[in-house]
């Protein structure tokens, strides 16, 4: 694996390092800023892996830092090293809050202690913050004088010697609850005519565990991970609602999406893709029986991530048109529609409509929400706090446009299309509670603590929201 890990400033000069093996020269990191500078002169795109004299420099950039791992073997697992570097930054963020050059210089003692624990002889070891915080705190350690105290001080925490290393024993809560959120983020690229060019669903199952003892949880989703949904003319997206239940009971009380009301609709089977589980999940149980069983860490964590590449109808749709007037002004008309079921409501909707860089003196008319001109983004921001399904709202904006000028013949020089005026796509943000786009549903969330046998309260919530790229291309 890695022979050494370095923290370098924005120029590539080392701030702090930890060598795990002696198979690289001490001067190896001195070549990194030179290699970095040479690549920056050649191109703006710098690969995350550099090679020099048989050494591989694998690095990530975070704020004003480069976190670098140097390896000697070409057969090293690059993906594992990059995963470790990202996890290392995550651990440091939990300790230092902000990982940047100044915080590295101010907390080198703590960082060295962490580097000794997260990796041993170049092989990743403990990367769970909750485990590390059991015996590495931000306070300085006092010198231990007696040999007996030294033996006790070097003894590993109980969690490290347990089969469940991510959860220590003896956890107690006054009220035993487990909160499960299924959050689906929609990335979509659409044309102005409504054609979907690209769409995907990024799912994240988040858990907040407030359970005593060593509970064993069993999570069941519809049809063991391969589930069905029904398509009709109104929408191709089934909704879901948040539910609560007592211990060992089903958490989904609403009718199944395979009910008789869907008999005349088209049935489509959907299978989760790119599944990624937290280490607490028993993978063999899932592979054999498609049941998710786990002993959760205490507090918040991501239980599962998944992706679906499937064509879906736009949830929030906008039709943007531009009219150019002869007096150096343009008028922008936008109609927005919530293409979701009427019982669902989109919240915190934000529609960012691009305008020319030299636009000025805006005036607005709108039916709902609020409008704001954002000159630093050359855009108009339309905010709608509540957008019920099936509703359609409209707005219009009139702006001055000095770039519309007379040509040599005395005629106005007019842009030929919306794309020539509104450079850039329309960006949309939204959130729809109690709603899933893919159709995934929790059938049950059972909690069992064999020793304490307490009453527990599982809670399930569904949220669909826009992803990082939900845009309408104006071409």
Curated annotation (Swiss-Prot):
GO terms for biological process: Golgi to vacuole transport; intracellular protein transport; vesicle targeting, trans-Golgi to endosome; vesicle-mediated transport. The lineage of its organism: Eukaryota, Fungi, Dikarya, Ascomycota, Saccharomycotina. This is AP-1 complex subunit mu-1-I. InterPro entries: Adaptor_comp_med_subunit (IPR050431), AP2_Mu_C_sf (IPR036168), AP_mu_sigma_su (IPR022775), Clathrin_mu (IPR001392), Clathrin_mu_CS (IPR018240), Longin-like_dom_sf (IPR011012), MHD (IPR028565). Belongs to the adaptor complexes medium subunit family. It comes from Saccharomyces cerevisiae (strain ATCC 204508 / S288c) (Baker's yeast). Residues 175-473 form the MHD domain. Disulfide bonds: none annotated. The gene is APM1. It comes from the Eukaryota. Adaptor protein complex 1 (AP-1) is a heterotetramer composed of two large adaptins (gamma-type subunit APL4 and beta-type subunit APL2), a medium adaptin (mu-type subunit APM1) and a small adaptin (sigma-type subunit APS1). AP-1 interacts with clathrin. The keyword Membrane applies. Present with 4420 molecules/cell in log phase SD medium. Pfam families: Adap_comp_sub (PF00928), Clat_adaptor_s (PF01217). One of its GO terms (molecular function) is clathrin adaptor activity. It is found in: Cytoplasmic vesicle; Cytoplasmic vesicle, Clathrin-coated vesicle membrane; Membrane, Clathrin-coated pit. Residues 240-262 are annotated as: Disordered.
């Amino acid at each position: 694996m890695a022979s050494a890990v370095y923290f370098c400033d924005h120029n590539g000069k080392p701030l702090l390092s930890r060598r795990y093996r002696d198979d690289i020269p001490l001067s190896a990191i001195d070549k990194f800023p030179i290699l970095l500078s040479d690549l920056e002169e050649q191109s703006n795109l710098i690969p995350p892996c550099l090679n020099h004299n048989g050494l591989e420099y694998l690095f990530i950039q975070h704020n004003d830092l480069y976190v670098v791992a140097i390896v000697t073997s070409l057969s090293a697992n690059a993906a594992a090293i990059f995963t470790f570097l990202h996890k290392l930054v995550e651990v440091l963020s939990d300790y230092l809050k902000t990982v940047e050059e100044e915080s590295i210089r101010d907390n080198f003692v703590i960082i060295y202690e962490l580097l000794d624990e997260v990796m041993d002889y170049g092989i990743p070891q403990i990367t769970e913050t909750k485990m590390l915080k059991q015996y590495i705190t931000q306070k300085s350690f006092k010198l231990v004088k007696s040999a007996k105290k030294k033996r006790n001080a070097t003894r590993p925490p109980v969690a490290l010697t347990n089969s469940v290393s991510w959860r220590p024993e003896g956890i107690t809560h006054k009220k035993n609850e487990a909160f499960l959120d299924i959050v689906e983020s929609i990335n979509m690229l659409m044309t102005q005519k409504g054609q979907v060019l690209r769409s995907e669903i990024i799912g994240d199952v988040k858990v907040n565990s407030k359970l005593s003892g060593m509970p064993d949880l069993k999570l069941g989703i519809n049809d063991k991970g391969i589930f069905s949904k029904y398509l009709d003319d109104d929408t191709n997206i089934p909704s879901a609602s948040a539910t609560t239940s007592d211990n060992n009971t089903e958490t989904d009380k609403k009718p199944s999406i395979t009910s008789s009301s869907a008999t005349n609709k088209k049935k489509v089977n959907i299978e989760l893709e790119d599944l990624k589980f937290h280490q607490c999940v028993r993978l063999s149980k899932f592979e054999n029986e498609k049941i998710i069983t786990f002993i959760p860490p205490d507090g918040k964590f991501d239980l599962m991530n998944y992706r679906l590449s499937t064509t879906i109808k736009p949830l929030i749709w906008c039709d943007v048109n531009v009219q150019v007037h002869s007096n150096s002004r343009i008028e922008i008309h936008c109609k927005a529609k919530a293409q979701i079921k009427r019982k669902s409501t989109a919240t915190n909707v934000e529609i960012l409509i691009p305008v020319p860089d030299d636009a000025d003196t805006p005036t607005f008319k709108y039916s709902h929400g609020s409008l704001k001109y954002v000159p630093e983004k050359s855009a108009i921001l339309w905010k709608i706090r509540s957008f019920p399904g099936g509703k359609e709202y409209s707005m219009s904006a009139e702006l001055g446009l000095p770039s519309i000028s007379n040509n040599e013949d005395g005629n106005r020089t007019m842009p030929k299309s919306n794309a020539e005026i509104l450079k850039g796509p329309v960006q949309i943000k939204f959130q729809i509670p109690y709603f899933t786009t893919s159709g995934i549903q929790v059938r049950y969330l059972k909690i069992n603590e064999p020793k304490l046998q307490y009453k527990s309260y599982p809670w399930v919530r569904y949220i669909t929201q826009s992803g990082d790229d939900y845009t309408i291309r104006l071409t």
